[in-house]
């Protein structure tokens, strides 16, 4: 038997704000709020095949590019429309040396955590 990813934990300055951003991006809902921690996940709740995201408050600033990032896919619109939606939600473009020929967009959430918007290649859940 193998393990599966059930939670991804993100250290951040504003757990509630970052949780709200990622709820908008992923269509997730807030599942639990305990102290300085906010957990979000699919509407199905805990135990879903998709992992939850936990945002924990930290006072330590981000110092370098993360070695792990999320890739997201639009499920109900094309990549250009999804890019516009994500930018309106608070994402911003990030230049990491792309050539312009890539099939993805590199973005950052409101606290500067990088993620990529890929071409649509998944079905809605």
Regions found by a protein language model. Give the residues of each.
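Vicinal oxygen chelate
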Residues: 2-12, 32-33, 39-42, 46-56, 60-83, 103-108, ...
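Short acidic, gly/pro-rich beta-turn/loop elements at beta-sheet edges
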Residues: 18-20, 50, 63-65, 80-82, ...
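A solvent-exposed interaction/effector surface
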Residues: 26, 56-63, 82, 113
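Residue-level marker of positions within ordered structural domains that often coincide
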Residues: 27, 75, 117
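A broad, low-specificity signal for short, low-complexity segments enriched in glycine/proline
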Residues: 1-3, 16-18, 28-35, 67
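Amphipathic alpha-helical segments
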Residues: 14-29, 86-90
């Amino acid at each position: 038997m193998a393990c599966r990813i059930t939670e991804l934990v993100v250290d951040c300055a504003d757990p509630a704000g970052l949780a709200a951003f990622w709820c908008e991006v992923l269509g997730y809902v807030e599942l639990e709020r305990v102290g300085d921690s906010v957990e979000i996940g699919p509407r199905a709740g805990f135990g879903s095949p998709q992992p939850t995201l936990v945002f924990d408050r930290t006072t330590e600033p981000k110092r370098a590019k993360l070695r792990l990032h999320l890739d997201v896919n639009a499920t109900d619109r094309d990549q250009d429309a999804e890019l516009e939606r994500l930018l309106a939600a608070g994402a911003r473009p990030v230049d990491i040396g792309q050539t312009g020929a890539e099939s993805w967009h590199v973005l950052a959430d409101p606290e500067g955590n990088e993620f990529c918007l890929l071409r649509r290649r998944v079905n809605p859940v």
